[in-house]
From Swiss-Prot:
The lineage of its organism: Bacteria, Bacillati, Bacillota, Clostridia, Eubacteriales. GO terms for molecular function: fructose 1,6-bisphosphate 1-phosphatase activity. The keyword Hydrolase applies. Pathway: Carbohydrate biosynthesis; gluconeogenesis. GO terms for biological process: gluconeogenesis. Belongs to the FBPase class 3 family. InterPro entries: FBPtase_class3 (IPR009164), Metallo-depent_PP-like (IPR029052). It is an enzyme of class 3 (hydrolase). Its EC number is 3.1.3.11. It catalyses: beta-D-fructose 1,6-bisphosphate + H2O = beta-D-fructose 6-phosphate + phosphate. Keywords: Carbohydrate metabolism, Hydrolase, Manganese. This is Fructose-1,6-bisphosphatase class 3.
Length: 668
């Protein structure tokens, strides 16, 4: 450490107002010096473990388990601590106990003959494991992670060695007393949760919490309780955020996707969205229509014929409303350049055809009872009334609004963190691999400036309630981020939803990807992006989601010689037959980067009862010769700045520029 140069008094004088404010927190040479010592010590601690997960798609059971087992980190810690001294079955049971302490304890109490003995052995093991996982943190940080009921006891046990002769009786008596007063179960639950918390210092969710899975609201509820998290919004997140902001086109899309996959639990049970008006509307207008192309796609769901018929009618009804609402945005925003997606006016109902890109296609469904051929994008009176009711439901759902505010507070379109660049979709590129310029609000933007602008507009969509014009533009932009040709979240030229419903020709269903995906394996592209985002190309990685890695076909998630890592989690069951696995997660600890591939998860019930974990295979991507310290991280840079400021404060005290507060007057 180099102390601040006392001769640079002009710098100190220039910052005197700030230093006087800082002196309120550190009112003496002694307190400022102590803090410098503390901060300098923290810099030399090992870097905390980061856990990267992407594309959860509402699959809450798989995600919950992944969160609890930290992509295998807890199992590896158990192996490190206990090695061959424990049988594999004992290690498995210990891991399951840490993941699901309440449920596992219920089972053990029913089957264990000598419960007190089991408690004693288990408590020793959990304390030993907790000592190891907490060893890279300061006592202060560990203390903050402890539950209030057991904070003092856990801290005592973590900081004492049970094999030390002079403290052995003290250590043992604590454990025996916990058992004697019938608090062992509560203590096991508490320390298991502490272990779960301490094994991961930072959680990164790289998009798509929402989609077709049944429990997005359960996932966000769990994430909102996490101690340290950031989120990079995905395309499915942004459409829900737009819906919560009141964007009617986003609301229609959210409902359509939910109906497409017969997943109404998130809407109805999770957020209390009333879909009865839509059901009534659909039965009135599509009563005689079997809506064959709108039958829900279901996995592991047993729906009766009556349910399927109703969902199909609702699905078609909201789809037509969606196309009308999207048409209004396209006409309102010519700068989006999406006129080719205006298809309702290209329908010839009499002939049963669609004029698409100057080519005539036969429609496989010609029943459009709400379509006015003179004004095809106008909602009829019943549709307008329905859209108003649905919009009110979304805007007035307390839980949905709370969850979306959480996404805004903890999320962004991209994140630079510890020399890594995290984003869900892509950075829009031209065919030649250069950054694509996009004109928004009369500004021509590309790369970082484009994403920064889109991030601001997404926030205006939700928060600018007193500026209707800015809010409307922001909401339109949320829809564009969902499906626009230059959206960094969508990453494709067009979304062919209409064609998939109404045309048989598979060629019309194709969605051409942005050239970014063609260049993902090119180190030069990665270097260009690193430079654009002001990152060191030699020591940085792009961590990406969105597109499932087709491992089954030999695709490698490691691109561009390790510069770009694709970790689409594969949580979505519909993708697993294509990918061959349940996707990838990433761990970045003080020793390097570990990429973990996962097999499909059975269920939480089987995990608890049978000890079934997610079968995972870990690849070491990078291994550093000397452990990374806090000083090598973004937090380290902030701490260095704090030390610099405190050193200036010390000089100000010693030169008499700021007077120390009398020790007797300092209130602790």
């Amino acid at each position: 450490m180099t102390l601040y140069d006392e001769n640079n008094l002009h710098i100190i004088k220039d910052n005197l107002r700030y230093l006087k404010l800082l002196s309120k927190q550190y009112p003496s040479i002694s307190s400022a010096s102590s803090e410098i010592i503390n901060l300098q010590a923290i810099l030399n601690l090992p870097k905390g473990t980061e856990h990267f997960i992407s594309d959860v798609h509402g699959e809450y059971e798989s995600f919950t388990h992944m969160l609890k087992n930290a992509s295998g980190v807890i199992k590896r810690k158990i192996d490190d601590v206990f090695g061959t001294s424990l049988r594999e079955c004992d290690k498995k049971n210990l891991a399951t106990l840490i993941y699901y302490p309440e449920q596992k304890l219920d089972l053990i109490k029913k089957s264990e003959k000598n419960l007190e003995d089991w408690y004693k052995i288990t408590l020793y093991r959990l304390i030993r494991l907790c000592q190891i996982v907490s060893s890279k943190y300061t006592r202060s940080k560990v203390r903050k992670s402890l539950p209030s009921d057991f904070a003092y006891i856990i801290e005592e046990l973590l900081n004492e060695q049970g094999d030390r002769v002079d403290k052995q009786e003290y250590y043992n008596s604590i454990i025996e007393t916990i058992i004697d007063i019938d608090r062992a179960s509560e203590f096991i639950i508490a320390i298991s949760n502490v272990i779960q918390r301490l094994v991961v210092d930072k959680l990164h969710i790289i998009g798509d919490i929402y989609d077709r899975g049944p429990g997005a609201e359960i996932i966000i509820e769990a994430l909102s309780k996490h101690h340290s998290i950031d989120i990079q919004w995905g395309n499915h997140d942004i459409v829900w955020m737009g819906a919560a902001a009141g964007c009617e086109a986003c609301i229609a899309n959210v409902i359509r996707i939910s109906l497409r996959y017969a997943n109404l639990s998130t809407l109805e049970d999770g957020y209390g969205i009333n879909l009865l008006p839509l059901a009534t509307f659909a039965m009135d207008f599509y009563k005689e229509d079997n809506c064959e192309n709108f039958k829900p796609r279901t996995i592991d769901k047993n729906l009766n014929e009556t349910d399927i018929k109703l969902l199909s009618k609702m699905h078609k009804a909201i789809s037509i409303i969606q196309f009308k609402l999207e048409g209004k945005i396209i006409k309102r925003r010519p700068e989006f350049k999406m006129e080719e997606r205006l298809l309702l006016d290209k329908i010839n109902i009499k002939e049963g055809t669609l004029n698409l890109s100057e080519k005539i296609y036969k429609l496989i469904d010609t029943n459009f009872p709400t379509l006015d051929k003179e004004n095809p994008y106008e909602l009829n009176e019943r549709e307008r009334d329905l859209v108003e009711k649905l919009t009110n439901s979304f805007i007035n759902s307390e839980k949905l609004q709370r969850h979306i505010k959480f996404l805004y507070s903890n999320g962004s379109l991209y994140l630079k963190y510890n020399s890594n660049l995290l984003y869900h979709g892509c950075i829009p590129l031209n065919e030649d691999g250069s950054l694509k310029e996009v004109t928004l609000c009369k500004e021509t933007l590309k790369g970082k400036s484009l994403l920064d602008k889109l991030d601001r507009l997404a926030r205006e969509a939700y928060f600018f309630k007193k500026d209707p014009e800015s809010k409307l533009y922001g909401m339109d932009m949320m829809w564009y981020l969902w499906c626009g040709s230059n959206s960094p979240l969508f990453g494709k030229k067009k979304m062919t939803t209409f064609e998939r419903y109404f045309l048989d020709d598979k060629n019309t269903h194709k969605e051409e990807k942005n050239p970014y995906y063609k260049y993902r394996n090119d180190e030069k592209m990665c270097t260009m992006i690193f430079e654009e985002f002001e990152l060191d190309a030699d020591n940085s990685h792009i961590i990406n989601g969105h597109i499932p890695v087709k491992t089954k076909e030999g695709e490698n998630p490691i691109k561009a010689n390790g510069k770009l890592l694709v970790i689409d989690g594969g949580f979505c069951k519909a993708y697993q037959p294509q990918t061959g696995i349940a996707g990838y997660t990433l761990i970045y600890n003080s020793y390097g980067l570990l990429l973990t591939s996962h097999e499909p998860f059975s269920s939480i019930h089987k995990a608890i009862v049978e000890g079934n974990d997610i079968l995972s295979s870990t690849t070491i991507l990078e291994h550093v010769s000397s452990r990374k310290r806090v000083l090598d991280t973004d937090s380290g840079e902030e701490i260095k700045k704090q030390i610099h400021d405190l050193e200036m404060l010390l000089v100000a005290y010693r030169k008499g520029l700021i007077k120390e507060e009398n020790e007797a007057n300092i209130r602790f």
